[in-house]
Amino acid sequence: MSETTELLARLVEIDSINPELVPGGAGEAEIAAFAAGWMGERGLDARVEEVAPGRANAIATARGSGGGRSLLLCAHMDIVGVEGMDAPFEPRIEDGRMHGRGSFDMKGGLAAVMAAAAAVAAAGLRGDVIVAAVCDEEYESIGAERVAAELTADAAIVTEPTGLDVCVAHKGFVWLDIETAGVAAHGSRPDLGVDAIAAMGEVLVGLSGLAAQLAGSRPHPLLGTGSVHASLIEGGQELSSYPERCLLRLERRTVPGETLADVEAQIAAIAPGAAVRSTFERAPFEVAADAAIVSAVHRHAIDVLGREPATVGHAAWMDAALLSAAGIPTVVFGPAGAGAHAVEEWVDLDSVERCAQVLEAVAREWCA
């Protein structure tokens, strides 16, 4: 078993369930301490930074001699829940795949980052190679927010799983609440009651129309179109009462070029008379396909893989958007596998090794 595979197995063994997703989840304190210790033992200047109680980032730097470009390698440590899984923290290797919670999303990418940084720690580079192992990507990304606010670099690579293709764009999202108001009354008094749930039905009809409109809009070349769906609905107290309120929570997935203001205007248009409020937003991400860091990853991927990687977009949101918004040219490149958030999750071990090799090669060139 290679050192990178041994490292990945140890990472999978550590419970790092995001406590915002699963009450009582372990959080990232233990895995951050392990990651910082592992990298510190291999010559990096490593530390743990608490972001919130029980929530931590591990930051490590292979310091250069000065005068070179810096490179930030970023991967998240938190994982989703394990309900229905059998032995989720006991990594199992079969047919070149490692099974276990987080193996694919995204401890495989984390292991690749750590291995690559360790490989260049004593390489005599001029520029810094910085590792940011971050918390909370699966919820609000408070870890990457901290990194974006406090660190900078000349480029960044996020190692979310891409199947060893080069990802240059991903979607964003907006969460919104819509609330309709009624008048509470006994179910026998239609002359007094106003049905807030029925009013929301009209909003849902409008939502279906908006979804169809978005599906027919001009697609982004890598991401397709934006979308919208109803996520949660609540209203009413009992069968024999007119409901005085109904709350709909929805998600609007966005593509580059769509803004929060655009989304809020669209939702307000289908919900006249209702209260509309955006509760959380993450912008989409896009980097030019000919950006220097994209070209470097593409070139070294060809050398390592013996094939030309595809240039792709990703439907899900990633921490890349936060780094890009902070002014750091960012690209996404990571291992292959399947089962993110699923009962059966695995990562291809050869792809983890090759990802680490590409990252190392990019760092040696970029930070020379």
Label each PLM-derived region with a short phrase.
Residues 1-101, 122-125, 366:
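Acidic/His- and Gly-rich active-site-bordering loop/insert found
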Residues 3, 40-44, 67, 122-126, ...:
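Short glycine/proline-enriched coil/turn segments at helix->beta-strand junctions
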Residues 74-75, 132-134, 157-160, 179-181, ...:
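Short beta-strand segments
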Residues 97-112, 186, 319:
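Glycine/serine-rich anion-binding loops at beta->alpha junctions
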Residues 106-175, 367-368:
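Acidic/histidine-rich catalytic neighborhood of metal-dependent amide-processing enzymes
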Residues 168, 175-368:
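Metal-dependent amide/peptide-bond hydrolase catalytic core
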